[in-house]
Amino acid sequence: MVKRMAEHNNMKKAVQQIMLGTVTGKHEQTLKVLNRIKASGYDGLELNRYMIHPTPMFVRMLTRIAGMPTGNGGRLNWHELIKVSGLSVISLHTDLGSLEKEMDAIIEEAKSFHTDKIVITGMYGFDYSDEKEIDSLIMRLNKAGKTLKESGLSLLYHNHNAELTCVDSGMRMYDILLRETEPEYVNFEFDSYWFADAGADPCRWMQTLGTRMKLWHVTDRGIRYSKKAMTPILKADSMELGTGNLELEKMKEIAEINGVEAVVLESHKNWINKDPMQSIELSGKWLKKTFKTYE
């Protein structure tokens, strides 16, 4: 009889769509990319609304300058591409303002992709140190989460490093977010890379989140040595899983204890050979080795 692993080892493995902006311009090219992702052991994608709808050239130019090119894939039929590739959609990323203005349309779009998770990508033009702004954000998140729950969906908040800003009370913004949002309506997609980038211990925060951590954004962090160093201080950046210095094995154990539903690979720069697909495939090898399942 084939031995079965514990249920918590059956975490889905996915790729964040932001990694695909430079390789998903045309239908056939994109289908080949998705097939390679599937063949590398991934179960699904995490889609971004701004990448599955046409966006102005100015917006695409700004994202490229920022190091996160969204590409020209917004004109493609992503429903067909997902179906043919055999991948699933883990969640749908959007911004809070769009969700509030287009709630019904976004709910229907999520359901059309057979996902029950809407993720807020973080706040822009926002003072992370101001308690009044944070209180307003919490009210908005709770309200949006309640509406989504009534439609059978759930709301998650995705962090970067700004959430570790200390506010007027001396607490970190993320502390207040955890304390004041309603677990019934608001939960979290935890990005361990960004908290490590800010000097925090991702493992401690994952333990603090507990079962409110529904999805895990992951990439490794380290130094890609390419030439003789002029000084002993080199720049650390995102790396393929298992090639950097983060305690990914320990994080994986905590994610399993928390009952995390999916681990989502995301890096938007410093890819091996500057190739996102090679990066995805290399990280996929680590994921397959680490998240073993038996049927």
Where are these regions (language model features)?
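N-terminal pre-domain/capping segments
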Residues: 2-117, 187, 285-295
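Conserved beta-strand positions
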Residues: 15, 47, 92, 120, ...
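Tryptophan-centric aromatic hotspots in well-structured domains and transmembrane helices
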Residues: 18-20, 42, 93, 157-158, ...
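Acidic-and-aromatic substrate-binding clefts and catalytic sites of carbohydrate-active enzymes
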Residues: 20-28, 47-73, 94-103, 125-135, ...
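Acidic/histidine-rich catalytic cores of soluble enzymes
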Residues: 45, 148-245
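Active-site acidic/histidine proton-transfer and metal-coordination neighborhood
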Residues: 75, 88-187, 277
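H/E-rich (His + Asp/Glu) clusters that bind or coordinate divalent metals
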Residues: 244, 251-252, 262-266
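Aromatic-rich peripheral "rim/lid" segments of glycoside hydrolase catalytic domains that contact
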Residues: 269-295
